[in-house]
């Protein structure tokens, strides 16, 4: 995950604090 996109990692965690990562969830599914 960190190797794929280290910059996004921080954004992902930040989204969790703000609320549900609706914009990050689809990206994760595609990566998987």
Curated annotation (Swiss-Prot):
Signal peptide: none annotated. It is found in: Plastid, Chloroplast stroma. Its main location: plastid. The keyword Plastid applies. Residues 13-32 are annotated as: Disordered. GO terms for molecular function: ATP binding. Keywords: ATP-binding, Chloroplast, Nucleotide-binding, Plastid. GO terms for cellular component: chloroplast stroma. Activation of RuBisCO (ribulose-1,5-bisphosphate carboxylase/oxygenase; EC 4.1.1.39) involves the ATP-dependent carboxylation of the epsilon-amino group of lysine leading to a carbamate structure. This is Ribulose bisphosphate carboxylase/oxygenase activase, chloroplastic. It comes from Populus euphratica.
């Amino acid at each position: 995950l960190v190797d794929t996109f280290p910059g996004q990692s921080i954004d992902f965690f930040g989204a969790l604090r703000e609320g549900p990562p609706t914009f990050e969830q689809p990206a994760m599914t595609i990566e998987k």
